[in-house]
Each structure stands twice: as C-alpha cells, then as structure tokens.
C-alpha cells in the first residue's frame, strides 16, 4: 500500500475551489478598476484609478496634459466608435453560436449513441479493466456522463470567449482616452483588462472541472476509471467550440484586415484605421472575435484537455486504484497554484512598478512571463511535496513504473520552462528589436518578392529551437513518469495561463485603442502612444501563439497516450501497413486544413475588396472625408463569409477520427494522430512566426525609430509598400491557419480518446472483411 499524500482530502476539497474563487474575485476587482475610467468628458472621473493613486500607475505625476483632454466631442466620438465595434462583435458571436449550438446538440447525441452501443446499451455493471476483482459502472453510464461533460466543456468555452470579447470591447475606448494622459495610464487600462479575461477564464475553467468531478463522483463512487473516462468529454467540448471560434474568428478578422489594407493602404494611400475606409469597423471587430474570443476558447481547450489527459492516466495508476483523492487531483492543484502565482505576478505590472516611457512597455510584459515562471517553479515544488505520495506506480502501456514525487516535480518544471524558451525564441524571430525581422525589413528595398522569400525562410528556421525544446521536455517527462509525465508537463506549460492570456488579450485591446484614436481624429501624439502599446502587444501575441502551439504538442501526445491505453493497444508498430498509411494521411491533414482556411480568407477578402472599391467609386465625397462610408455592409460581408467558410474545416477535423476509427480501426487512427501531430506543429510554428515577422517588419519601417528604419521609410515609399504586401500575405498565416492548427492536433486526439471504447469494439470494419 502506497503512503497517502501529506495534504488531507478535505483540504484538497477546500483549497481548489477557494483558489478558483480568488481568481474570479481578482478578475472582478480588475474590471472594477477599469470601469473607473469613465466614457465621459469629466476629467476627475477618468483620472481616478484606485485608492492609492501614486502606487498603481494612476499617480498625478504621470499625467501629461494633452490638447483635447476636456474636449467633449472627442469623448463622444470614442464612445460611438466603441459601441459600433461592440455591436458588430456581439452580433457576429451570436450568429456563430447559433450554428455552433446546433452542432453541439448533434454531436452530444453522437457521443451518447456511439459510447452507449459499446455494450449494447446494457445497464449491467461490468468488471473493471485494470482491476478485474472489482465491478465498474456500465458503458451506458459513461456515455451519458461523457455527453454531459461535453456540453459543460462546450458551454464554458463559449462563455469564456464571449466574456473575453465583452471585456475587450469595454476597455478599448477607455485605453484611448487614458492615452491622452500618458502612455503609462493607457498601458495599465489595457493590461488590467487583459487580466480580467485571463483570470476569469483560468479560474472558471478550473471551477467547472472541479465541480463536475465532484458531482460525477456521487454516482460513480469508487469507480474512478469510469469517472475520469467520462470527464474526457469536458476537454472535447472545450476544444470543439474553440475550433469554430478560432477558424470563424480568424476568417472574419483577416478578411476585413486584408480588404482594408489592400484598398486603403496600397490603392488609396490612406493610413491604417482611417475612418474613410469602409472596412475599418469590420477590421476592429475582427481583432475582438479572432484574437480575443477565438484565442480565449483555444487556450481554455488546451487547459481542459491537459487536465483530462492527466486525470485519465492517473485514474489507472496506483493513487487512482488506492483512491488517494489529493494525489489524483494533482493536476487541479497545479492549476490552483498557477492562479495564485499569476495573481502575484500581475501586481508587478499594475501596482509595484510604473510605466513612464515607451521603451519600458515591452520589458514589463516580458517580465510577466519570467516572474510567473520563476515563482511557479517554487509553487510546483510545494504542490508536489504536499499533494503527492513520496513514491507511487504509474501505468505504462501494460507495465507498472515506480515514480518518486520529485520526478513528477521535474516533469512539470520541464514543461513550464520549455514554454518560456519557446516564448523567447518566438520573440527573437518576430520582434523588430532583433536582426531577423530587421533583415526581412531590409529585403523590402528590392520589392515584395524578396520580402516574401526572406519571411518564409525566417519562419522555417524559427521552428528549430522550439521543436528541440518540445522534444527534450517529452523525453525527460516520459523517462520519469511515462505518459502521465507528458500530461503534467503540458499542464506545467499551461499553469501560468492567466498571465499568458492577460498578455495576449492586451495586444488586441491596444490595437483597437489605436484604431479608435485614428477614427476619432485624435492628435498624432496620442496615436504614437497607442502604436507603441500595439507594437509591444504584437510581439507578445506571437509569444502567446508559441505557447499555444507548444502546449498543444504536449497535450496531443498525452491524449494520444491515454487513447492508446484506453483502446487497449500495446504497441504502435510503424512497420505495419495499417499504421504507416495512417501516418501518411495524418501528416497530410494539416496541409489540407491550412489550404481550406487560407482559401476561405482569400475568397472572403475578395468580396471585401470589391465592396470597399465600390464604395470609394460610388459614394461622392468619401475620399475627401465629407461623406460617411457604409460600415455595416462590410461587417455583414465578413460575418456571412466566416460563418459559411468555417464549416468545411470544422467537418474535416471532427469527422476524420470518426471515419478512420470506424472503417480502419484503432491502429490506423493512432498513425493518423501521430502524423498530424508531427507535421501540424512544424507548420503552425512556421506560419505564425512568418506572419508575425512580416507584420513587425512593416511596423519597423512605419515607426522609423532607427537610422536603418528611416532609410526604408516613410509610409508610402516603395519598401513600405513591399512590406505591406508581405504583412497582408502573413495575416491569414499568423491569425487563421497557424493558430487553428494547434486545435486540429489536440481536437483529433481528444475525440479519439472519448470514442476509444467504441473504436476498440466496433472499429476497423474494412480490415475485418478485406
């Protein structure tokens, strides 16, 4: 008998929900502070930011009085633009959720029917798989509870995306107004708003998962194998919604962006976010539905799946069989500690230090990543000491492996630090402070073609170090604790999700703030401040995508291990034709998926370009600024195109595991999962980094800070036009195809895990008859 963990079960039952509630309370507090910035012209109201004005970045000595601070018309204009963006984003998400709701009901029925049929819808108890002396609940119960967990995961994912979007549209105009009083104040509003989303999502995801486990436990009793098999539905629900959010939102935002850039910047030579551009509102709406709602759902899905993979593998290990609830909840304890660590880290940006100069913005965001990683390392050590037995056995493909608690601590740390390494490598390749992006900018001297060649080369090269980081973390964690080690390494990478999301959400909020400043006709000085916030946000957004892709690789492998265990496969032999055909098809899927999403952006952008051109040609006085463009038509084009175009890629991802598993069996499906993981990660990293580099090369030329940048500019010069073309090509790569691919590799793996009993029983019908 293994000695139990130091932390009593009762304490675990209390601590996990308390940490989640603290996270939610902290996000509400941040929202309250942001709401103190009024969308009125009352200067006193907009400058009060908290109890201790001097400490939290709202100090009087930070105020830089600017013309227009007391201008009622500017404030009214900002409020009007904010309302238009908010309404556009809300209407798109409601339209998307109608379609997604239909899918959710249909797929919930599929889960119930497929899993219920494993034992012919029998209601009799069955012998447990790993301990045949005991009886476990019937497959029909697992089918019913998996369906409930799926719906819960889906609803939580949708809500987290929607609330994130609401917070972002609430904060964007407030950031613009605060920029009148200095860059420090604008930074605080944008970052606090990001923190609202980060903590709300991390804490609510943990709380819903924790409550679900405890409610299911009432029925399952000591059948933990069945309980945690049913919980996998939660991860599937979260990720399937994220797929539609990422793809639909990505198509929306890039159709508007490409359309606005091609006609506005290149043909008409007007600045970005100019109110004369008919696609400008759609472009700003897109930032919220793609980069906020889509990204929020995506990281929530990763987090839910990593937890589910760890719980499934743990349930068949010694602390699952011995019913040590604290050790079993080790993944939840890591996430709980992560919320507390991120809370402390956030205070460094909002309360302990003040941003006074533009050059301090990017280091402040990078410090968030470093501080959270360092403190989290200590946090993991504490959790591993109190939450785990000193030694225990882990199920390892038919054999038992003895693991010490310090080995599991190292597994989580390896994932955590690999995430930081991937983040900083991504920054090196996508920030215009370093030579790779400056080289891409320099290549614009000779036109768009050389810019594209340099950008593609940069993207391919940027894959090398992240892949080594992922490979080393897989090797170390698997050597120590088999597939459970890989699952907790993925959780380690995602443990600081609240800080990661805060930084990610900060970017689009700053971007929107700049757009609002331009549309409201505010001074050049204010636009410079919002551009500085946005440039820092662009780099950190690329870091966030690196995190998402790296964690997706680890999560996918952990889910793959859980699938292989649950489907009863002992070895996956690459030399057998069943597996090799799966590998080849799996490696092809990310290309097929990328082709679909890229073409969708292209065809939607085509419609947008035609509409923007039509308005410039037919509305008299539009170019002169005496007539208003028809923004609503452009918003409608983006909405209709993205809803229609998100369905084929969604079907490809959702149907592939079902078709392969049913017709070709679990061995071929395991090949498909391995193939899609291997090629998907590479394409996702290179696509995201190529697009990010082109974007920042353009911004490098536009900012004209260094002598080198000045020699390439100003806006409208030939090198600048070449950079805009590169940026436009990179838009769908970095914001649609790249980020969506990490959902493809995770979602196929978690879906295979949920349906594993069905495939093991009824799958492979073609090989049975031929």
UniProtKB/Swiss-Prot annotation:
Ubiquitous (at protein level). Mostly expressed in vascular tissues, meristems and root pericycle. Residues 37-88, 168-190, 253-290, 351-358, 430-451, 510-538, 607-635, 694-736 are cytoplasmic. Mg(2+) 1 binds at residues 257, 261. HAMAP family: PPase_energized_pump (MF_01129). It is found in: Vacuole membrane; Endosome membrane; Cell membrane. Contributes to the transtonoplast (from cytosol to vacuole lumen) H(+)-electrochemical potential difference. It establishes a proton gradient of similar and often greater magnitude than the H(+)-ATPase on the same membrane. In addition, facilitates auxin transport by modulating apoplastic pH and regulates auxin-mediated developmental processes. Confers tolerance to NaCl and to drought by increasing ion retention. It catalyses: diphosphate + H2O + H(+)(in) = 2 phosphate + 2 H(+)(out). This is Pyrophosphate-energized vacuolar membrane proton pump 1. Changing residue 504 to E: Abolishes H(+) translocation and strong reduction of PPi hydrolysis. The record marks 246, 291, 298, 305, 735, 746 as: Important for proton transport. Monomer. Substrate binds at residues 254, 734. It is an enzyme of class 7 (translocase). GO terms for biological process: auxin polar transport; cell wall pectin metabolic process; establishment or maintenance of transmembrane electrochemical gradient; leaf development; regulation of starch metabolic process; response to salt stress; response to water deprivation; sucrose metabolic process. Changing residue 427 to D: Increases H(+) translocation, normal PPi hydrolysis. Induction: Repressed by light. Induced by CAMTA1 and/or CAMTA5 in pollen. Activated by K(+) and Mg(2+). Inhibited by Ca(2+), N,N'-dicyclohexylcarbodiimide (DCCD), N-ethylmaleimide (NEM) and aminomethylenediphosphonate (AMDP), and, to a lower extent, by fluoride (KF). The gene is AVP1. The keyword RNA-binding does not apply. One of its GO terms (cellular component) is endosome membrane. Disulfide bonds join 128-136. Keywords: Cell membrane, Disulfide bond, Endosome, Hydrogen ion transport, Ion transport, Magnesium, Membrane, Metal-binding, Translocase, Transmembrane, Transmembrane helix, Transport, Vacuole. It comes from Arabidopsis thaliana. Coiled coil: none annotated.
């Amino acid at each position: 008998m293994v000695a139990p963990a130091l932390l009593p079960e009762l304490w675990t039952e209390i601590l996990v929900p308390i940490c989640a509630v603290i996270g939610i309370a902290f996000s509400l507090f941040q929202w309250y502070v942001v709401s103190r910035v009024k969308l009125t012209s009352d200067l006193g109201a907009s400058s009060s930011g908290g109890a201790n004005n001097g400490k939290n970045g709202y100090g009087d000595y930070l105020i830089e009085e600017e013309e227009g601070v007391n201008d009622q018309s500017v404030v009214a204009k900002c409020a009007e633009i904010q309302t238009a963006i908010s309404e556009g984003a809300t209407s798109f998400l409601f339209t998307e959720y109608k379609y997604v709701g239909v899918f959710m009901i249909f797929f919930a029925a599929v889960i119930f029917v497929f899993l219920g049929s494993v034992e012919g819808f029998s209601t009799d108890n069955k012998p447990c798989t790993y301990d045949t002396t005991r009886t476990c609940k019937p497959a029909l119960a697992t089918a019913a509870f998996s369906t409930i967990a799926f719906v819960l995961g889906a609803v939580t994912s949708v809500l987290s995306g929607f609330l994130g979007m609401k917070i972002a549209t609430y904060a964007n105009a407030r950031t613009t107004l605060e920029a009148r009083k200095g860059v420090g104040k604008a930074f605080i509003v944008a970052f606090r708003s990001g923190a609202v989303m980060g903590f709300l999502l991390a804490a609510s995801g943990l709380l819903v998962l924790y409550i679900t486990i405890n409610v299911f436990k009432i029925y399952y009793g000591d059948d933990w194998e069945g309980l945690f098999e049913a919980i996998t539905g939660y991860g599937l629900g979260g990720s399937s919604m994220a797929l539609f959010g990422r793809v639909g939102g990505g198509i929306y935002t890039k159709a508007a962006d490409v359309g606005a850039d091609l006609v506005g910047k290149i043909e008409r030579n007007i600045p970005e976010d100019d109110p004369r551009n008919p696609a400008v509102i759609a472009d700003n709406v897109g930032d919220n539905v793609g980069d906020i709602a889509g990204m929020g759902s995506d990281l929530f899905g990763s987090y839910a799946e990593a937890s589910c993979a760890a719980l499934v593998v743990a349930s068949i290990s010694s602390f699952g069989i011995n019913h040590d609830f604290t050790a079993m909840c080790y993944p939840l304890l890591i996430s709980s500690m992560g919320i507390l660590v991120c809370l402390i880290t956030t205070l460094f940006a909002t309360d302990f230090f003040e941003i006074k100069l533009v050059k301090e913005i990017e280091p402040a965001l990078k410090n968030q990543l470093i501080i959270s990683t360092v403190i989290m390392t200590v946090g993991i050590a504490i959790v591993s000491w109190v939450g785990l037995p000193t030694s225990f056995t882990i199920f390892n493909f038919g054999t038992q492996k003895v693991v010490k608690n310090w080995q599991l601590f190292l597994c989580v740390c390896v994932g955590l630090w690999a995430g930081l390494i991937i983040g900083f490598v991504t920054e090196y390749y996508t920030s215009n402070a370093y030579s790779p992006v400056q080289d891409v900018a320099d290549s614009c001297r000779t036109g768009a073609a050389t810019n594209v060649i340099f950008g593609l080369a940069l993207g391919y090269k940027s894959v090398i170090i992240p892949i080594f980081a992922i490979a080393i973390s897989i090797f170390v964690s698997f050597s120590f604790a088999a597939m459970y080690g890989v699952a907790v390494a993925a959780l380690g990478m995602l443990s600081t999700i609240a800080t990661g999301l805060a930084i990610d959400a900060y970017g689009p909020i700053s971007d929107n703030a700049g757009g609002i400043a331009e549309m409201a006709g505010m001074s050049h000085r204010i636009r410079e401040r919002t551009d500085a916030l946005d440039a820092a946000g662009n780099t950190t957004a690329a870091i966030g995508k690196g995190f998402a892709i790296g964690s997706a690789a680890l999560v996918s492998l952990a889910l793959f291990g859980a699938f292989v265990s649950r489907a009863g496969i002992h070895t996956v032999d690459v030399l057998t034709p069943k597996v090799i055909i799966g590998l080849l098809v799996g490696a092809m899927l990310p290309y097929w998926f990328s082709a679909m999403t890229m073409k969708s952006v292209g065809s939607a952008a085509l419609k947008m370009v035609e509409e923007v051109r039509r308005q410039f040609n037919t509305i008299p006085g539009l170019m002169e600024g005496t007539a208003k463009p028809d923004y609503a038509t452009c918003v409608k084009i983006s909405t209709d195109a993205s809803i229609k175009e998100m369905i084929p890629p969604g079907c490809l991802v959702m149907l592939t595991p079902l078709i392969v598993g049913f017709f070709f069996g679990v061995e071929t499906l395991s090949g498909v999962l391995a193939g899609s993981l291997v090629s998907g990660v590479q394409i996702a990293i290179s696509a995201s980094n190529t697009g990010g580099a082109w974007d920042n090369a353009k911004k490098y030329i536009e900012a004209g800070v260094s002598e080198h940048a000045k020699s390439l500019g100003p806006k409208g010069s030939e090198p600048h036009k070449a950079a805009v073309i590169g940026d436009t090509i990179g838009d769908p790569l970095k914001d649609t195809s790249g980020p969506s691919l990490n959902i493809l590799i995770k979602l196929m793996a978690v879906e295979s895990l949920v349906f594993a009993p069905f495939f093991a029983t009824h799958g492979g019908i073609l090989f049975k008859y031929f």
